[in-house]
């Protein structure tokens, strides 16, 4: 008898909102040469095919730094750099063009696979390459001639868009052509950044050896603003890691965000399925550089009632929260503050003011189970306290049966029922016997 796979069913259901959001979006994938020669690249190709199948418009920009270095070393040519940029003379460039051409054909071949009993079965991806990047020479700097090293001058947005409209995957190498008929060796990070910005892509996805940017404890930082990412970049440069994959990709991600790309992701090319988990789960796996946070604390609206009910119902059934009907929520929705993450309400609290006493009750405090070990509760208390201050409230109080110590740790002190506003004393449930705690907020 065939067995049911609940984990597969759960994964499909959880990913559905992201499938809908990403359909028709444009993603630029930036993949360095290290990723191309890693054993997991075959799995990444399968994941790229899946994204294509889901209706996502893809541009893949690849690099060839390690392959170039290896080929030059075999030829007995020592790589020359100036200000972290390769100096590409005639002899070196002839080899680099061969390397990039070979990689382009190899990637195209892998994306063209369609063997039965493989993830690529029936994929039929149309891969298009061309002169989509116009380059110009870097010229001479401090007396050093960069020769065939160049920079991006222009991206053929119309040409790329035309191919994406035909459901083709656009493959771009780090070699650009110029109006004079020459070609130049480019930084793949610069190419990917310019393509993402000029195309007004929805995402730039970078592949690194690490699972995002790591904190001091070795954990991936989930989200960074460009300013925070710049601080980490300075730390990497001070540690002598300015040429590391993480540093190179951080520069591209920061510039992309500031150029208008909403989100740039940094994921590992070593971990199977890292890109899919980053794109189709709420918390992802790597690091995203964002212009605006995927999570925000805000005032609730009538559209949030369903999400609030989903959040508080389990706590009501456990007796932790007092039961509220949908009708009551509709009447009191303007009193609620919520924390929303990618469309899911993960926290809520209500504020009931007693203006005569300059006191307010923070009630219906709830945090989604997946986020209770984070600082979301503190964010919620701070947001509600801030709202209370604006209304002229001097003292915030809570009634709780289970979370006494949690509130004590955050500066709330015990209060007698008799010290509550008179109107609230009349509503006190003596059978429930909730503990009362309060905190001065001004």
From Swiss-Prot:
The keyword Transferase applies. This is Amino-acid acetyltransferase. Its EC number is 2.3.1.1. PROSITE patterns: GNAT. Transmembrane segments: none annotated. Belongs to the acetyltransferase family. ArgA subfamily. It catalyses: L-glutamate + acetyl-CoA = N-acetyl-L-glutamate + CoA + H(+). It comes from Aeromonas hydrophila subsp. hydrophila (strain ATCC 7966 / DSM 30187 / BCRC 13018 / CCUG 14551 / JCM 1027 / KCTC 2358 / NCIMB 9240 / NCTC 8049). GO terms for cellular component: cytoplasm. GO terms for biological process: L-arginine biosynthetic process. Pathway: Amino-acid biosynthesis; L-arginine biosynthesis; N(2)-acetyl-L-ornithine from L-glutamate: step 1/4. Its main location: cytoplasm. In bacteria which possess the bifunctional enzyme ornithine acetyltransferase/N-acetylglutamate synthase (ArgJ), ArgA fulfills an anaplerotic role. Keywords: Acyltransferase, Amino-acid biosynthesis, Arginine biosynthesis, Cytoplasm, Transferase. InterPro entries: AceGlu_kinase-like_sf (IPR036393), Acyl_CoA_acyltransferase (IPR016181), Asp/Glu/Uridylate_kinase (IPR001048), GNAT_dom (IPR000182), NAGS_kin (IPR033719), NH2A_AcTrfase (IPR010167).
């Amino acid at each position: 008898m065939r067995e049911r796979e609940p984990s597969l069913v759960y994964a499909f259901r959880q990913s559905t909102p992201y499938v809908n959001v990403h359909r028709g979006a444009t993603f630029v994938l930036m993949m360095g040469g290290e990723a191309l020669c890693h054993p997991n690249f075959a799995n990444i190709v399968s994941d790229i095919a899946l994204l294509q199948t889901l209706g996502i418009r893809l541009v893949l920009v690849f690099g060839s730094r390690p392959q170039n270095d290896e080929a030059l070393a075999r030829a007995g040519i020592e790589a020359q750099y100036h200000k972290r940029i390769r100096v590409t003379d005639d002899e070196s460039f002839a080899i680099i063009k061969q390397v990039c051409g070979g990689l382009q054909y190899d990637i195209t071949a892998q994306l063209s696979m369609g063997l039965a009993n493989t993830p690529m079965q029936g994929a039929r991806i149309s891969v298009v390459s061309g002169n989509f990047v116009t380059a110009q020479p870097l010229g001479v700097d401090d007396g050093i001639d960069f020769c065939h090293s160049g920079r991006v001058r222009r991206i053929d947005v119309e040409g790329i868009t035309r191919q994406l409209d035909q459901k083709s995957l656009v493959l771009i190498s780090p070699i650009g052509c110029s109006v004079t008929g020459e070609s130049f060796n480019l930084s793949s990070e610069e190419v990917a950044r310019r393509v993402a910005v000029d195309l007004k892509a929805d995402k730039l996805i970078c592949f690194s050896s690490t699972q995002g940017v790591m904190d001091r404890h070795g954990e991936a930082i989930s989200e960074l603003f460009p300013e925070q990412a710049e601080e980490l970049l300075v730390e990497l440069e001070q540690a002598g890691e300015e040429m590391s994959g993480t540093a190179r990709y951080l520069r591209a991600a920061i510039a992309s965000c500031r150029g208008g790309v909403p989100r740039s992701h940094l994921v590992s090319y070593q971990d199977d399925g890292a890109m899919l988990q980053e794109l189709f789960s709420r918390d992802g796996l790597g690091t995203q550089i964002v212009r605006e946070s995927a999570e925000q604390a805000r005032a609730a609206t009538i559209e949030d009632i369903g999400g609030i009910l989903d959040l508080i119902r389990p706590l009501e059934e456990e007796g932790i929260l007092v039961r509220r009907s949908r009708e009551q929520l509709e009447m009191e929705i303007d009193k609620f503050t919520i924390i929303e993450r990618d469309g899911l309400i993960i926290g809520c609290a209500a504020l009931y003011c007693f203006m005569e006493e300059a006191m307010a009750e923070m009630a219906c405090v709830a945090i989604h189970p997946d986020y209770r070990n984070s600082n979301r509760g503190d964010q919620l208390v701070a947001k509600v306290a801030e709202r209370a201050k604006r209304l002229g409230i001097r003292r915030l109080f809570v009634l709780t049966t289970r979370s006494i110590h949690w509130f004590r740790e955050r500066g709330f002190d015990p209060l007698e029922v008799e010290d509550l506003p008179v109107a609230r004393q009349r509503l006190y449930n003596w059978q429930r016997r909730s503990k009362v705690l309060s905190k001065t907020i001004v």
